[in-house]
Amino acid sequence: MEIIIISGRSGAGKSVALRALEDIGYYCVDNLTMDLVPQLVDMLENKQHLVAISLDIRNLPQEPETLDHILNLLQEKYPVKIIFLDTDRNTLIRRYSDSRRLHPLSVQNLSLEAAIAAEKEHLEPLVQHANVIIDTTPLSPHELAERLREFLRGNTEKELQIIVESFGFKYGIPLDADYVFDVRFLPNPHWNQELRPMTGLEKPVIEFMQKHIEVDNFIYQTRNYIENWLPMLEKNNRSYLTIAIGCTGGKHRSVYIAQQIGEYFRAKGKKVQIQHKSLEKHTQNK
C-alpha cells in the first residue's frame, strides 16, 4: 500500500493535484482531519493499494509534536510520501482576487495578506516532513499534473530526478530549490551592447562566457560539489533534487551555467531536467 499526502498553502493547487492523482488510479480523500488519517489508512489497507489524502491548514493539529507523532505512526507501517505545494505571496493574492474565494483563515477576521502569512507559519512543521516541495507559481494545472506524474514515476523507479534551473534574483529565489548558487559575481554579458538582447543559450554569449577562466572554475567546482554528495542524496529516499543557479535577471550567466551543469549530469546518465525560469519574462517584455 502506498500513501501520498498532499498539502500546501491554500491556493497553491491541492485540488488540482488530487484530481491528477485520481486520474492515475489513486483512491483520493479530501480534507480529512489529521487525527483520522491512521484510522482511514488501516481501514483501506486490504482494499486500496494507492491512497492519496489532501490536508489543509484546517485539518492539521495545533501542536507540531502531534503532527510528528501521527506521521511517525504511519511511516512505521506504510510507505508514505508527503508532497507540499508552495506558491509565492503575490501569486496567491492574485489567485484569490481572481477567484473571489475566501482564504480558510479569513474566518478569523484576518486580511488576505495576514491570513497568507499566518498559514505559512502554521504549515512550517509539515514542510519539514515533505519529500518534495513543488513551487506551483509558474505552473498551469496541466503542468502541475505532469510534475506530479514525474514525481511518482521517479518514486516507482527509485531514480533521483535532477532539476537544474536558472533564475533571476530580481524575480525572487525559486521556492522549490534545494541548492541555490549565486553567479552575480561572474563577468556579465549584459554590459556588452551586442550581447545584451541575447540569452545564455546563444552562441555569442556562450563564447563570451567560455573566454573567462573564473566561469570555467565555477562550473567545475560546482558540479564537483554536487557530484560528491549525489550518492548520499540518492540513498536518502528523495525523488527530486532541484539546483537553482541565479544571476541578476536570469538571462545570460545563470542560463549558460545551468545549461552546462545540467548537460554534464545528463551525459553522466542521470535523469535531468533543465529549466530557465526567467527567460519567459524577458520574452514577454520584448
Swiss-Prot record:
Molecular function via GO: ATP binding; GTP binding
Pfam families hit by this protein: PapZ_C, RapZ-like_N
Membrane-crossing residue ranges in chain numbering: none
Binding site for ATP: G8, R9, S10, G11, A12, G13, K14, S15
Coiled coil regions in record: none
Keyword annotations: ATP-binding, GTP-binding, Nucleotide-binding
Keyword Iron: no
Entry binding sites for GTP: D56, I57, R58, N59
HAMAP family named among the record's database cross-references: RapZ_like
Family statement: Belongs to the RapZ-like family.
NCBIfam families, alphabetized: PRK05416.1
Alphabetical list of PANTHER family matching this protein: RNASE ADAPTER PROTEIN RAPZ
Primary role: Displays ATPase and GTPase activities.
Name by which UniProt lists this protein: Nucleotide-binding protein HSM_1595
